[in-house]
UniProtKB/Swiss-Prot annotation:
Residues 305-485 are annotated as: Mucin-like region. The record marks L57, L63, R64, F88, K95, I170 as: Involved in receptor recognition and/or post-binding events. The signal peptide region modulates GP's high mannose glycosylation, thereby determining the efficiency of the interactions with DC-SIGN(R). N-glycosylated. Residues 33-650 are extracellular. This is Envelope glycoprotein.
Amino acid sequence: MGVTGILQLPRDRFKRTSFFLWVIILFQRTFSIPLGVIHNSTLQVNDVDKLVCRDKLSSTNQLRSVGLNLEGNGVATDVPSATKRWGFRSGVPPKVVNYEAGEWAENCYNLEIKKPDGSECLPAAPDGIRGFPRCRYVHKVSGTGPCAGDFAFHKEGAFFLYDRLASTVIYRGTTFAEGVVAFLILPQAKKDFFSSHPLREPVNATEDPSSGYYSTTIRYQATGFGTNETEYLFEVDNLTYVQLESRFTPQFLLQLNETIYTSGKRSNTTGKLIWKVNPEIDTTIGEWAFWETKKNLTRKIRSEELSFTVVSNGAKNISGQSPARTSSDPGTNTTTEDHKIMASENSSAMVQVHSQGREAAVSHLTTLATISTSPQSLTTKPGPDNSTHNTPVYKLDISEATQVEQHHRRTDNDSTASDTPSATTAAGPPKAENTNTSKSTDFLDPATTTSPQNHSETAGNNNTHHQDTGEESASSGKLGLITNTIAGVAGLITGGRRTRREAIVNAQPKCNPNLHYWTTQDEGAAIGLAWIPYFGPAAEGIYTEGLMHNQNGLICGLRQLANETTQALQLFLRATTELRTFSILNRKAIDFLLQRWGGTCHILGPDCCIEPHDWTKNITDKIDQIIHDFVDKTLPDQGDNDNWWTGWRQWIPAGIGVTGVIIAVIALFCICKFVF
């Protein structure tokens, strides 16, 4: 009778019943009592989505270009690996595109390569192109190579990023970072996303240690640059080098440099001293500092791990070459029978090092190295006066044979790569150690005869301040080069990306925990970073809203803690954001092509409007929640009473919903009884 009676109600009673039902429904909507349908009110269409439905092409001021560094995705940044990505080619003109903001780089490069005939391999930078302004380490490579081509291009199609200009070629003596150019789509209200910021900050702003900006230059010597037989030497000073045969982190090189200085293992004459690193040594110590004062080394190199070995370089001795005594005057071309002074035992106890205007003292290591030698053949090189002299070439073998368990300790929390830069020496052969040649030492076997040689062509400081000077950059149109924004790398959107950072054995997990831009004043304006289409290989991809401040929890949480759930969400976010970005770009391109006919909406009508919703905020919130619940917090004790209350409390919303449904049914039943 209940159902039949309701269907046969008179019109006035039916109206009263319907009125009470609508009151219940409105009551439920007001107090959000669930009736079995879940509504997510947090999914909102933002201003960027509204741009898609305009009937005309919006202003190009809504597009902003950003340079993203390849190292953010884990490409190898050591010099031997990085240079393999570059190659010479002729017949292709260089292309330049300007960008508005650049990401702070951990590793930058500066090349000065000559051909065997002495001519330059790389072209000079055109007017307006200056070095990349934010580099933690600048790897400065000098040397020779065949250079079979007019320009050096990136084999993978990426750009070489300079100061607000990205070029397809490398310019001589100009610091650059590898990267790609990405474009942001900003709503009209955000058109000043990159506000007018000075192209060059005041000098005192960069020299202030508290600003966190300082740069360390690491120098190298290269032979056969650009070939498969390229050899690299890390320059400790103008006469002391380390042969690079494997991947080295900048932190390792700085630690090695400090050890060489403090243990007195530099060349003490005008001869050239080369060290060689044992392949068994872990050369991947350290982690990405990214301008933060924090612990970034797993351990320090101890002088107990160092031992000298004299090796033969395959050259023949020159007959008739008579040994002579050594003079401290670098201009004296004489030989000596005692080669102990090649590595002085009595180096200064305090070595002054410089890092962006700051001076720090590096004290002696407590224990000196154990040194043993064996005979070697001597090379012959022409001296400055065109005379031939024997050149001693030593190699240092770094081994861990003398390691003791108690010596395996980590560095202090305040030890950073910036606090242990390579020591600065004056140009030319050091003279302080030459005054101590009379002191006996039993580190080296005096049987081997050495000869000094002037080596002033490589004079220079290993660690120098990376200075940023020059006038304002001109726009790409003033460079006399072909300007192309996308063509050089647009074909690399697919196929050239590395999926994750390369894993290094026995090293701390590496990631880029911070994202710094050196032209924007408002980090909180990172809302536009969710819509980056990136061009070129191995780009890091999408930086979403809010990651400027919580990227430690998102990016490092993904890579270091290997949270598969978080990784899956991040990949899903990346894929959906790419699709959304490309759909917006395609729509704007269609609007541009159809502008003369009134635009897309004029032709298609209301059907033209599409709204590719941005779920970035929701996904990032879920990622944050996962990290908060499963990473940052320890699991509670299951026997705790609070857990029972928490577990019972989470049923409250469902209980309220069920109660609301029961009340509605009872009220409906009462109304029907009252009516009948």
